[in-house]
Amino acid sequence: MNGRRRWGLVAAMTGLLVIGSGVAGASATVAPITREGVFRIEGPNRYATAVEVSRAIAQPPQEVVYVASGTNYPDALAAGPAAARAKAPLLLVAPNAVSPEVIAELKRLEPSEIRIVGGPNAVSEDVAATLKEATGAEITRIAGDDRYETATLLGEGVTDPERIWVVSGESFADALAAGAAAAHDHSMIVLTRRDALPEVSAHKLVELAPAQVAVAGGNAAIAEATFQLVQDAAPGAQVSRVEGTDRYATAAAVAKTVWPRGSAVLFFASGVTYADALSGTPAAALSDAPILLTRADRHPAATIDARLALGSGTRITLGGASASFMESTAPEPIVGPAPEPTQSTPPGPSPTDDVNCSSFATQTEAQGWWESHGYSPGNDPHGLDGNGDGEVCESLPG
């Protein structure tokens, strides 16, 4: 049975009705963040940060809460726009464990339904059972045979979209900014390989026949031949590439493309790890705001340029200081950019090196390197995740 059939059966059993670009009965007990100024939403880890975002936008009872992996990005990439369309918070779990903060938040939210994104390798059946026991909610799993099909299943309910975003399914960076853009469009993201457009992704483009398709990322992420395949799958669409010289510049280009008149609110999140931007997407959508990417120690020049161009007075940083830089209220000077990592070369040692935890200065650096190369508790060739909880090199500071 393929992923689409699995989704249809689960939807029927839970009474879920998917219509238009949203979800019937989507919760009305969410609201944009009203605090103004320059501030940070953070917890001591990615799971707690997602909880703090949820607490900032959602009040009980919730009809739907989305749950995705905090350690395995492929299945989780497309969850942000889906949660945003449903006006639902998005919480994170480890593959085989749920943090006490997440359990407490789910109990506070009193959801009628929890939608788990990804298969049992991303979020185990034990975790699903724990969520059921803690909340009594109906549990729905949205999972295809691979990340590409999962992304298309997360797009169920999108009809007659003006624009669809196509991003790499082999790295997470461009999907972070594109997720907020897709949420603005009440649309979805479709995943592709660099050198081939998966059949399930092509079928989704054919099925929805959007007026526009935006391909986020440069040739290092999505090859020109694949760009042509996207055009072939959407012959009636205006297909364009939105790119920059690196992930930060691409995120800036996405924001300036979708919000040409600026935005009253800007969100900032790490460009090295995916979790904070993912769980922040529903909050950004409620504020109709882009997500710009940053480093731990500074804003890249492209991020500063976008912030100045978009002209926001309220700037919300997702995650702690060890992950994401937060500027002061004073304007920052624009200085020449330092060398930036490209999508094809994540920062840190080469995967072929003899890598261990001593190769990194901080836990955040190690975690970002590990995730950038697509590693997970079940795929950890360097043994950085000793206890299999998805958090690597936990003895390192920060």
Where are the regions that the model predicts?
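Actinobacteria-biased recognition of intrinsically disordered, low-complexity terminal regions
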Residues: 1-4, 354
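Extracellular glycan-binding segments that recognize GlcNAc-based cell-wall polysaccharides
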Residues: 3-10, 16, 24-347
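Calcium-binding acidic motifs and repeat modules
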Residues: 343-387, 394-398
